[in-house]
Each structure stands twice: as structure tokens, then as C-alpha cells.
Regions:
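N-terminal leader/targeting segments and the first structural element of proteins
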Residues: 19, 23, 52-61, 67, ...
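Active-site helix/loop of acyl-thioester processing domains in fatty-acid/polyketide metabolism
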Residues: 37-55
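Short histidine-centered beta-strand/loop micro-motifs
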Residues: 29-32, 71, 107-108
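HotDog/MaoC-like acyl-thioester-processing domains
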Residues: 3-18, 73-74, 85-177
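Long, compositionally biased, intrinsically disordered segments
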Residues: 15-17, 33-34, 41, 58, ...
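Conserved interaction-surface patches within small, structured recognition/assembly domains
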Residues: 59-71, 77-85, 100
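A conserved, well-ordered hydrophobic junction motif at loop->secondary-structure transitions
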Residues: 25-41, 172-177
Length: 177
């Protein structure tokens, strides 16, 4: 199916916003949010954006980048905003903006950014689930979407490297000779 026949959705149609308080059980030895917990929040939020855009089940193909910019302290809130920023035929890139807020002062800050790639899963085994094209609306969406092709090219280059790398990694148990 040619691109001109594909449905087009606005980035904002896939937008998801999820907010959590950083509780004592969520923190590491530095008294900041444990990175793995944030990764889980990001993947959860981004997967909803991808499903909302494609109206299908999705799987996480890769967490392409996660840049930690500012620690999220205990009793602050963490707000993840995600939306689709680029698509292939069955894949979708989702951008996540992670904002922190000091709930005592109201100070807000950019804590992290992330790009994740998802693949739409067809209901019928062996079929491909074509995803709609995406069109940005806001200044931020346009800025982020404009970089999609460059990020995709970088992912493809990295993917080739990692596929070759994985072929040389042993699957033997570490305690066997």
C-alpha cells in the first residue's frame, strides 16, 4: 500500500501523560528514583501511545535512547509524556519527555528524554500490521518529528552492528568449560 493511501494521524492523538509520586520504595541508595523503575514507567506509557496510534497490540523493539538529565528525588513527582514521532510500515518511534516536580515548591524540571521503537502486531499470524502515518502539530512535535529520519538511520546502523555482535556472544553457561 502506497503512503498516499495510508491513514494519517496527528501526533497529539497518541499522546499519553502518566504521573507518579516517587515513594521511598522507588528510590536507590542516592535517594533518587531507581533508573529501572523509570524505564518501566517509560515503556508502559510509550506502549500506550504506540497502541493508541496503531490501534493494535504492540511489542517493544528497542529502547533506543534514555538520557538522564536531572535526578528525580524522593517525594517529587515524575510525569511521563509520550507521543508517536515517526513511523515505518509496521514500526513506530515514540518520544518520551520526563518531567520532575518538587511537590513542596512547585519547581518543574526536565529529568530525562527517551526514544523507543515499537512494532505493531497483526491479529492474524504471519500478516503485517501497517501503521498510520504521523503528522506533528505543535512546535515541539514538529521539532522532534523532523529528526526522525536521522534517528532511524542511526538505529539501522546500530542494529546491524548489534546483530553481528550477538552472533559472537556465547550461550554457554559461565561455569562450564
Amino acid at each position: 500500500m502506497a503512503d498516499q493511501n495510508r491513514e494519517v494521524k496527528k501526533s497529539w492523538e497518541s499522546k499519553v501523560i502518566q504521573t507518579h509520586r516517587v515513594f521511598p520504595g522507588d528510590i536507590n541508595s542516592h535517594r533518587t528514583l531507581f533508573g529501572g523503575r523509570l524505564m518501566s514507567y517509560i515503556d508502559d506509557t510509550a506502549s500506550i501511545s504506540a497502541s493508541r496510534h496503531s490501534r493494535s497490540d504492540v511489542v517493544t523493539a528497542s529502547m533506543d535512547t534514555l538520557d538522564f538529565l536531572h535526578p528525580l528525588n524522593e517525594n517529587h513527582s515524575v510525569c511521563i509524556e509520550s507521543y508517536v514521532t515517526g513511523v515505518g510500515s509496521t514500526s513506530m518511534e515514540v518520544f518520551c519527555k520526563i518531567m520532575g516536580e518538587d511537590l513542596s515548591s512547585g519547581e518543574r524540571y526536565l529529568a530525562a528524554t527517551s526514544f523507543i521503537t515499537f512494532v505493531a502486531v497483526a491479529k492474524e499470524k504471519g500478516k503485517k500490521q501497517l501503521v498510520p502515518l504521523v503528522e506533528p502539530s505543535t512546535k515541539e512535535e514538529k521539532f522532534v518529528c523532523e529528526g526522525y529520519e536521522a534517528r532511524k538511520a542511526q538505529r539501522m546502523s546500530s542494529r546491524s552492528f548489534h546483530e553481528q555482535f550477538a552472533q559472537t556472544i556465547t550461550d554457554q553457561l559461565p561455569w562450564s568449560n
